[in-house]
């Protein structure tokens, strides 16, 4: 049974749309404790720590009956947008979101999503989660943005959507109409590479 160690609604929807059975349990890992400067590696390390934090504390959680015995796969993900070598997380306010979009207009950047799948068996009686395998990879997609007028950027920023998304945009939301094209995995830009998950979940 798959556990999504994330509160992300985008990742949840991707799994639901593909009819992948899973439970969503948010990881309580403190992301500020990681100091990795390489953006590619940072996304991977954060994904691992999210999944690992849940695996280490799983015995303290009130799990559904289906998860109390047998094989478990814990999926941790983290997305970071890279623009000209700089990491763009969620904008802290509308002003920052507007400035970013001014820079990104007509340009391209990379959406890196770190993926970690911790595979093991959990026995609720002994409260032991025995890890058998850990699979990790960062998947990167190139995102091209349309040339936008200031009023278009302001209109988008005023929806508040950019404030809740890595990089300040949501491909599956209002921001999708401002994205010219994607090179690489499409679903990766929404926070989870479904081809990567299929390959490693159903081996």
From Swiss-Prot:
Cofactor requirements of the protein: a divalent metal cation
Lineage: Bacteria, Bacillati, Cyanobacteriota, Cyanophyceae, Synechococcales
Gene Ontology annotations for the cellular component aspect, listed alphabetically: cytoplasm
Family: Belongs to the Maf family.
Protein name: Nucleoside triphosphate pyrophosphatase
Localization per Swiss-Prot or TrEMBL: Cytoplasm
PANTHER family: BIFUNCTIONAL DTTP/UTP PYROPHOSPHATASE/METHYLTRANSFERASE PROTEIN-RELATED (PTHR43213), BIFUNCTIONAL DTTP_UTP PYROPHOSPHATASE_METHYLTRANSFERASE PROTEIN-RELATED (PTHR43213:SF5)
UniProt source species: Prochlorococcus marinus (strain MIT 9301)
Catalyzed reaction equations: a ribonucleoside 5'-triphosphate + H2O = a ribonucleoside 5'-phosphate + diphosphate + H(+); a 2'-deoxyribonucleoside 5'-triphosphate + H2O = a 2'-deoxyribonucleoside 5'-phosphate + diphosphate + H(+)
GO annotation (BP), single: nucleotide metabolic process
Record has Transcription as a keyword: no
């Amino acid at each position: 049974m798959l556990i999504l160690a994330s509160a992300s609604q985008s990742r949840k929807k991707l799994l639901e749309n593909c009819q992948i059975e899973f439970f969503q349990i948010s990881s309580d890992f403190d992301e500020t404790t990681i100091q990795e400067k390489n953006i590619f590696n940072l996304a991977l390390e954060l994904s691992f720590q999210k999944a690992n934090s849940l695996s280490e504390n799983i015995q303290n959680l009130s799990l559904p009956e289906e998860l109390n015995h047998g094989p478990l796969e814990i999926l941790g993900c983290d997305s970071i947008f890279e623009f000209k070598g700089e990491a763009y997380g969620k904008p802290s306010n509308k002003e920052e979101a507007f400035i970013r979009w001014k820079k990104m207009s007509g340009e391209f950047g990379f959406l890196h999503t770190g993926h970690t799948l911790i595979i093991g068996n959990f026995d609720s009686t002994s409260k032991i989660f025995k890890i058998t395998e850990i699979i990790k990879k960062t998947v990167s997609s190139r995102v091209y943005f349309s040339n936008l007028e200031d009023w278009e950027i302001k209109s988008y920023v005023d929806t508040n959507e950019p404030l809740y998304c890595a990089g300040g945009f949501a491909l599956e939301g209002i921001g999708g109409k401002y994205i010219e094209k994607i090179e690489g995995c499409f679903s990766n830009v929404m926070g989870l590479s479904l081809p990567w998950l299929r390959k490693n979940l159903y081996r």
